[in-house]
């Protein structure tokens, strides 16, 4: 009878775990005029990015500034990974990012795994996940070379205006670079380390979606999943086992395929299935950051393109570190 009562109470609580509808984008104080681009314009924007990056990585330091100015505005604003962080202007871009990268990896190649585009509010954007591969032959970011092949996981979002990129967000997984360079400096990952694989059942680069409703539906599915994360059973005084069951039966469940893969950055790792995601990352993360706000800042990017969607915050999360459950640090 007590077990039956527990199940009834559990189902009763689930009825009230409704996904709240709210704006997930950046909080803005000025009126802006939304832009919408056609599928053909979106395809051309993606080709513009692919072709120019292919030229830059092909020629490397040969005519570098000229090649960069074919795609980037001279006053480009760059938001980068630690320790490069934020800076402006094409000369800073060359000095801080491109020259050190090409010096350290003289044969570096770029392989796109996913590239998608769209518009969000008043911004036209193209985003990608790519792998930058090359022999590590000279120091990079203060790390001595190990003279081995390195695969850098790289995620980018570029804002395009007047046929030039005016702002870029570039995140290279530096912790994974350290791992491959034999410089592991943190606790072991809960998940599995290694490459992030390309899409399993579709081409993530050379696709063209004419039906804008499909792209919008892909984005809305992702945003609904994002909003579901604001439901926080860890705020209640419950056991770890009960929290696990609550997360497995959380409203997020409606948005994940049974064989889903969650690719986390190095230090966290990759997990398979919702149960694996809960065990390897979500449950310990929620216990460590029970006091957190996903939406105090909001997304600067929300785009859908065919089967794919892309959201991003800069920065994404404000939280209080409350326990060592997640990565084991006091």
What are these regions (language model features)?
Residues 1-330:
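C-terminal and inter-domain tail/linker signature
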């Amino acid at each position: 009878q007590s077990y039956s009562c527990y199940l009834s109470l559990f189902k009763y609580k689930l009825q009230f775990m409704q996904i709240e509808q709210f704006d997930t984008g950046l909080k803005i104080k000025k009126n802006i005029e939304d832009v919408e681009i056609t599928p053909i314009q979106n395809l051309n924007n993606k080709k513009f990015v692919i072709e120019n990056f292919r030229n830059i990585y092909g020629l490397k330091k040969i005519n570098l500034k000229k090649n960069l100015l074919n795609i980037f505005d001279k006053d480009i604003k760059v938001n980068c990974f630690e320790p490069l962080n934020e800076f402006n202007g094409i000369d800073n871009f060359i000095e801080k990012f491109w020259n050190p990268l090409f010096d350290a990896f003289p044969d570096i190649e770029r392989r796109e795994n996913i590239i998608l585009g769209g518009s969000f509010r008043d911004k036209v954007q193209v985003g990608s996940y790519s792998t930058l591969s090359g022999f590590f032959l000279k120091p990079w970011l203060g790390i001595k070379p190990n003279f081995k092949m390195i695969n850098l996981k790289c995620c980018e979002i570029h804002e395009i205006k007047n046929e030039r990129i005016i702002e870029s967000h570039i995140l290279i997984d530096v912790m994974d670079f350290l791992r491959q360079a034999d410089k592991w400096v943190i606790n072991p990952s809960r998940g599995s380390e290694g490459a992030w694989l390309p899409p399993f059942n579709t081409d993530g680069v050379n696709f063209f979606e004419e039906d804008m409703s499909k792209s919008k539906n892909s984005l809305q599915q992702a945003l609904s999943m994002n909003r579901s994360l604001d439901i926080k059973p860890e705020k209640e005084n419950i056991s770890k086992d009960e929290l696990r069951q609550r997360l497995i039966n959380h409203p997020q469940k409606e948005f994940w395929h049974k064989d889903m893969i969650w690719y986390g950055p190095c230090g966290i790792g990759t997990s398979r299935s919702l149960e694996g995601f809960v065990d390897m990352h979500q449950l310990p993360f929620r216990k460590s950051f029970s006091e957190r706000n996903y939406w105090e800042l909001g997304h600067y990017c929300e785009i859908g393109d065919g089967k794919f969607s892309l959201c991003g915050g800069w920065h994404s999360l404000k939280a209080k570190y409350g326990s060592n459950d997640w990565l084991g640090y006091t």
